[in-house]
C-alpha cells in the first residue's frame, strides 16, 4: 500500500476532471485517472499529472470504466486498489449531456435513461462501493480531516433548462446524493461536499460558445467570464488540503455569481 494519499477522479481524460487531476498532482497526490473510452486523452492527462507532480514517488494510472455500468464501477474500484492499495478521496466528476437538446414535450425516455444512468446512478453507486471499502478496511486517512468525497454537479441542479430536462434532473438528484452521503458518513470520518460549477469552458459547451459569450457579456455571470477546469481543480485542491474542516454536505458555488438573485 502506498503511503501517499490517493485520489480517484471520474471523467478525468479532459475538461473539469483533467483540471482536478492536474491540480491534485501538483498537490502531491497519486491519482487514478478514470476515462470512459478516450485512451489517448487519458494518457495526456497522466502526462500532465506527471509534469505537475513535485515528487517522483507519485503514481498516475489511467483506468477505463463506464461509471454508468455496474460491472465497470466495480472494475474501477478494484483496479484503483490493485494499483495503490488505498483510496483517500473520490471526485465524482464524470457526466454527459443529452445527445440532442430537445424540448421536454419531445424528449425521449432513451435519452433520460442514458443521462441519468451516467450522471446520477453511476456516481451514487460508485460512492457506495468506495464507502463500503472504507467502512470494511478502516485504515487511517492520510488527508487532513479524513477521507473526502466531492460531487461535481452544475448550476443546472437548480436552474431549469426546458431543452435538457434530463440533464437538470440528473444534477438535481446528484446534489441530493451529496447531502445523503454527507449525512451517512460524517460520523465515519468522511467529508462530502458538492461543487456546483456554472458556465464552464469545456468540450461539452463548445457547441454553444457563441450563445454564452453573448450572455456573459450581457451580465448573466456577474464576474463576466467563463469558468475553467482550473477553477474547479483549485476548489478540489482546497478541499483535499482540509480548508473546510467543519463543513460537510455543503454546496460550494463556482459560477462567477450566477446563482445570486438580482433585480
Residue ranges, per PLM feature:
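Short C-terminal tail/terminal secondary-structure segment
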Residues: 97, 101, 219, 237, ...
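Substrate-binding pocket helix/loop in short-chain dehydrogenase/reductase
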Residues: 101-104, 108-116, 217
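Residue(s) in the substrate-gating loop at a strand-loop-helix junction
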Residues: 154
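Alpha-helical segment proximal to the catalytic Tyr-Lys
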Residues: 132, 182-184, 245
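Short, small/polar-rich loop/turn modules that mediate ligand/substrate recognition or access, typified
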Residues: 186, 191, 247-249
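Conserved glycine-rich cofactor-binding loop
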Residues: 13-15
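Active-site helix of classical SDR
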Residues: 127, 170, 178
Amino acid at each position: 500500500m502506498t503511503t501517499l494519499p490517493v485520489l480517484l477522479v471520474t471523467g478525468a481524460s479532459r475538461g473539469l476532471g483533467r483540471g482536478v487531476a492536474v491540480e491534485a498532482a501538483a498537490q502531491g497526490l497519486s491519482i487514478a485517472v478514470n476515462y470512459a473510452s478516450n485512451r489517448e486523452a487519458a494518457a495526456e492527462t497522466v502526462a500532465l499529472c506527471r509534469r505537475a507532480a513535485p515528487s517522483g514517488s507519485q503514481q498516475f494510472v489511467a483506468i477505463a470504466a463506464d461509471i454508468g455500468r455496474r460491472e465497470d464501477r466495480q472494475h474501477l474500484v478494484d483496479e484503483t486498489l490493485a494499483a495503490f492499495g488505498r483510496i483517500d478521496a473520490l471526485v465524482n466528476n464524470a457526466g454527459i449531456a443529452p445527445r440532442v437538446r430537445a424540448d421536454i414535450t419531445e424528449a425521449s425516455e432513451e435519452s433520460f435513461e442514458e443521462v441519468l444512468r451516467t450522471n446520477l446512478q453511476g456516481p451514487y453507486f460508485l460512492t457506495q462501493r468506495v464507502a463500503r471499502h472504507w467502512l470494511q478496511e478502516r485504515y487511517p486517512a492520510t488527508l487532513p480531516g479524513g477521507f473526502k468525497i466531492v460531487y461535481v454537479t452544475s448550476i443546472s441542479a437548480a436552474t431549469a433548462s426546458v431543452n435538457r430536462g434530463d440533464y437538470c434532473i440528473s444534477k438535481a438528484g446528484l446534489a441530493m446524493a451529496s447531502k445523503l452521503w454527507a449525512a451517512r458518513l460524517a460520523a465515519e470520518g468522511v467529508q462530502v461536499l458538492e461543487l456546483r460549477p456554472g458556465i464552464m469552458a469545456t468540450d461539452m459547451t463548445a457547441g454553444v460558445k457563441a450563445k454564452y459569450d453573448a450572455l456573459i457579456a450581457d451580465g448573466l455571470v456577474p464576474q463576466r467570464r467563463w469558468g475553467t477546469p482550473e477553477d474547479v481543480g483549485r476548489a478540489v485542491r482546497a478541499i483535499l488540503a482540509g480548508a473546510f474542516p467543519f463543513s460537510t454536505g455543503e454546496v460550494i458555488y463556482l459560477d462567477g455569481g450566477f446563482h445570486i438573485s438580482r433585480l
